[in-house]
């Protein structure tokens, strides 16, 4: 069977932590920021974890990650 390919778009956007959880950046932080409050923008700075319901889908995109 041939090697499975890593989805390069997902590999650039997602990181697998040591405990096996998947870290992602938050959406809504690239433009149209004038209408958002400073509190909203501050909370968007911090990364989030991919939900457990999406973990299997992410595992298919990143077959060689932990």
From Swiss-Prot:
Cited Pfam families: Ribosomal_L35p (PF01632)
Gene3D superfamilies linked to this entry: 4.10.410.60
GO cellular component terms given for this protein: cytosolic large ribosomal subunit
Domain of life per record: Bacteria
Sorted UniProt keywords: Ribonucleoprotein, Ribosomal protein
GO biological process: translation
Gene Ontology molecular functions: structural constituent of ribosome
NCBIfam families: rpmI_bact (TIGR00001)
Family: Belongs to the bacterial ribosomal protein bL35 family.
Name the record gives this protein: Large ribosomal subunit protein bL35
